[in-house]
């Protein structure tokens, strides 16, 4: 099953928990974790359909306000 990890950078003036709540509502999301380091949140997504996975990242995630940047990692 295709899996993706998305590193999320958020607006510092906006509560992380609100973004985490919105991310948890997206299709294909399995886990959302707040982290320390250059990124604020790590999101794990998985789906049998690669198109649905890409759509969750490229269409739904980018619409969440206060996400300033993302980096998607897909293991081989």
Q: What positions do the PLM features span?
A:
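A compositional/biophysical signature of low hydrophobicity enriched in polar/charged and small residues
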Residues: 1-76
